[in-house]
């Protein structure tokens, strides 16, 4: 019973860390990264579809993304979707592929991106803390229902706290790495 509660809390915390990694991957850091376009949805026969499901997205150079659609007819739609996105990127097409040159980030934009990254990291820290709170509530309920002794619950709560601290540290490391990547000129 207690082990299940601990395992469930840890799984939620793992999901929060993975979610943060995905979120931060989509933040532009001055380098071309195919993950930038993961959230760009293209209207493909009336259905919003991610770019990476319609084309091969590659990064042959540090500041260049190349999108090679499997269906050439969708090329203009992909261009429109990229222009509409909040990425601030301008695609150029030659009829077969779309090239996106990633411009250098200004110092002001870098600091804005760092703020966004910190905000996202805090959101995911809150998720980890919520998982801790839920686990502690379940542990207290199991103590109240006489399913576990007070000592067992205390030990389990300490484990939950250690796990929480561990995942918060992981989030902080991920954030520090992303901040360094963003501030890199």
Swiss-Prot record:
UniProt keyword terms in alphabetical order: Cytoplasm, Protein biosynthesis
Organism this protein belongs to: Moorella thermoacetica (strain ATCC 39073 / JCM 9320)
Cross-referenced InterPro entries: Ribosome_recyc_fac, Ribosome_recyc_fac_dom, RRF_sf
Gene3D superfamilies membership: 3.30.1360.40, Ribosome-recycling factor
Subcellular location(s) of the protein: Cytoplasm
UniProt GO cellular component terms: cytoplasm
GO biological process: translational termination
GO terms of molecular function: ribosomal large subunit binding
Name of the protein this chain belongs to: Ribosome-recycling factor
Region feature (Disordered): 135-159
Function (record text): Responsible for the release of ribosomes from messenger RNA at the termination of protein biosynthesis. May increase the efficiency of translation by recycling ribosomes from one round of translation to another.
Membership in a protein family: Belongs to the RRF family.
């Amino acid at each position: 019973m207690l082990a299940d509660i601990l395992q469930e809390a840890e799984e939620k915390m793992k999901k929060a860390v993975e979610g943060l990694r995905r979120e931060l991957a989509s933040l532009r850091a001055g380098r071309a990264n195919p993950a930038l376009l993961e959230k760009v949805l293209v209207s493909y026969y009336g259905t919003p579809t991610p770019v990476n499901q319609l084309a091969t997205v590659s990064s042959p150079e540090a500041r260049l993304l190349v999108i090679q659609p499997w269906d050439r007819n969708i090329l203009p739609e992909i261009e429109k979707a990229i222009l509409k996105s909040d990425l601030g990127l301008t695609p150029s097409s030659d009829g077969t592929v779309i090239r996106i040159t990633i411009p250098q980030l200004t110092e002001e934009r870098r600091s804005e991106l760092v703020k966004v990254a910190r905000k996202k990291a805090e959101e995911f820290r809150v998720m980890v803390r919520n998982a801790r709170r839920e686990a502690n509530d379940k542990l207290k309920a199991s103590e109240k229902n006489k399913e576990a002794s007070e000592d067992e619950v205390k030990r389990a709560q300490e484990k939950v706290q250690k796990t929480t601290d561990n995942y918060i540290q992981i989030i902080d490391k991920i954030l520090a790495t992303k901040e360094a990547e963003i501030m890199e000129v």
